[in-house]
């Protein structure tokens, strides 16, 4: 049953109906639509449209429908209703007859769908926050267990300075904490109710919209009806948070894909998150991580697509806004799935400490320590930098790490170098010296783990 048929003398072309109908995706708003309808029925009592008895009958029928939807959501897609609002209203009329036709008094699908979508977003943000914090906790736990796993840190994908696997884990904890903060900030702006704004100019019934917002769990009601029914910047904000969050997960995946290669060999992934080859029996492919990396693109696409949809729309509601849902649903589903999968990857990961240590020792990652040593002996840093560069060239020529060059060799580059240089060139010394806040020293890493544990609870 269409909600708008009185104006028309011809039925819609079936091809147009298929093009126009949105039930195939907005069915996901069924629970929110029913919850919003219960609240609206209460508001109609306050303005005399419904009696208390009528409202109770409607609420009971809506609650039965809600339980039915939760038990068998696929039933919605068996309908030829235009959208979820039409479906809910049709089912309600089936249950209570003519009384069901009174529920839409003073309400438009414009404020109705805006409310449904915000309620869905609030529910989904709660799920995302939980999954985000679970991944943070998994990273902190992995860091706790790998504080002594020394490995090379990289710039330009070249070995740069020694770090620990724990410090690497904590870098992603910081990124995820910012993602969490972005979601919490978005939730504050999302937490306002558009219900009662009608099609665009507000409702003609003197409904207490603040009370109505409270019944729905919103912090307050929106302040402008035109903005309320045409606002989708909360969708953009969540898509932006998802796009940034997926970039972080993509980088996390790329790092571990590299660490897992035969060339690096720093970690081994669990059989539970890898797959094999149909041809090559020896293969163990990091499919979970590659899919996380690959799915990043579709989330960026959803954000860009929504930006382009909204950029030229006049106030207030336009049918273009029907395009707000599929990209949003897919992007947030994808982000949620990837958060869960990243945590699963960490659950069975094995860090190969000897190989990590070997790689850290091979990459001349202690070259900066030698430069700092020379500075402490009074050599200007720029000169020290040049001296150490020459020493590294010689070490490479001989196929040795810096710390294995004899003192006589090192003194050819600078006479100020003494026996006291060798303890400074050890990997442990390199770590210990990075003791300022945020550094890789064991003390700072332990503090960072303790701080993260306390924050996550």
UniProtKB/Swiss-Prot annotation:
InterPro entries, per the entry: Arg_succ_lyase_C, Argininosuccinate_lyase, Fumarase/histidase_N, Fumarate_lyase_CS, Fumarate_lyase_fam, Fumarate_lyase_N, L-Aspartase-like
EC number of the protein: 4.3.2.1
Enzyme class: lyase
Top-level taxon of the source organism: Bacteria
Pathway it works in: Amino-acid biosynthesis; L-arginine biosynthesis; L-arginine from L-ornithine and carbamoyl phosphate: step 3/3
A GO molecular-function annotation: argininosuccinate lyase activity
Annotated localization: Cytoplasm
GO BP of this protein: arginine biosynthetic process via ornithine; L-arginine biosynthetic process
Catalytic activities: 2-(N(omega)-L-arginino)succinate = fumarate + L-arginine
Family per record: Belongs to the lyase 1 family. Argininosuccinate lyase subfamily.
Protein known as: Argininosuccinate lyase
Organism from which the protein derives: Escherichia coli O157:H7
Species classification: Bacteria, Pseudomonadati, Pseudomonadota, Gammaproteobacteria, Enterobacterales
Underlying gene: argH
């Amino acid at each position: 049953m269409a909600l708008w048929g009185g104006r028309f003398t011809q039925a819609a072309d079936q091809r147009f109906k298929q093009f126009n109908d949105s039930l195939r995706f907005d069915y996901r708003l069924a629970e929110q639509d029913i919850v919003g309808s219960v609240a609206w029925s209460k508001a109609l009592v306050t303005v005399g449209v419904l009696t208390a008895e009528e409202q109770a009958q409607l609420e009971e029928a809506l609650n039965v429908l809600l339980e039915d939807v939760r038990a068998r959501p696929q039933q919605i897609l068996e309908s030829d209703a235009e959208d979820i609002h039409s479906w809910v209203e049709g089912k309600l009329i089936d249950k209570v007859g003519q009384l069901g036709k009174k529920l839409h008094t003073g309400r438009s699908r414009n404020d109705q769908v805006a409310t449904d979508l915000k309620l869905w977003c609030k529910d989904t943000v709660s799920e995302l926050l939980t999954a985000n914090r679970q991944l943070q906790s998994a990273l902190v736990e992995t860091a706790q267990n790998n504080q002594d796993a020394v490995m090379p840190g990289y710039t330009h994908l070249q070995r740069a300075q020694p770090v620990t696997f724990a410090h690497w884990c904590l870098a992603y904890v910081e990124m995820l904490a910012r993602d969490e903060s972005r979601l919490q900030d978005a939730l504050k702006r999302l937490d306002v109710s558009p219900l009662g704004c009608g099609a665009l100019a507000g409702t003609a019934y003197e409904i207490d919209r603040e009370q109505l917002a409270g019944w729905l769990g919103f912090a307050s009601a929106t302040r402008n009806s035109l903005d309320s029914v045409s606002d989708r910047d909360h969708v953009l904000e969540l898509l932006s948070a998802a796009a940034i969050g997926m970039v972080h997960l993509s980088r996390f995946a790329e790092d571990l894909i590299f660490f897992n290669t035969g060339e690096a060999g720093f970690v081994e992934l669990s059989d539970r998150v890898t797959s094999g080859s149909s041809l090559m029996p020896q293969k163990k492919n990091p499919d979970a991580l590659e899919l996380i990396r690959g799915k990043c693109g579709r989330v960026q696409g959803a954000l860009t697509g929504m930006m382009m949809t909204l950029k030229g729309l006049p106030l207030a509601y336009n049918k273009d806004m029907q395009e707000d849902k599929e990209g949003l649903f897919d992007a947030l589903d994808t982000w949620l799935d990837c958060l869960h999968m990243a945590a699963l990857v960490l659950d069975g990961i094995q860090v190969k400490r000897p190989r990590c240590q070997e790689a850290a020792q091979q990459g001349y990652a202690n070259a900066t320590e030698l430069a700092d040593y020379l500075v402490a002996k009074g050599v200007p840093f720029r000169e020290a930098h040049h001296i150490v560069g020459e020493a590294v060239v010689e070490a490479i020529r001989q196929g040795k790490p810096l710390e294995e060059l004899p003192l006589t060799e090192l003194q050819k580059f600078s006479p100020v170098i003494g026996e006291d240089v060798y303890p400074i060139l050890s990997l442990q010394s390199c770590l210990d010296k990075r003791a300022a806040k945020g550094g890789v020293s064991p003390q700072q890493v332990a503090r960072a783990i303790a701080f993260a544990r306390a924050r996550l609870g």
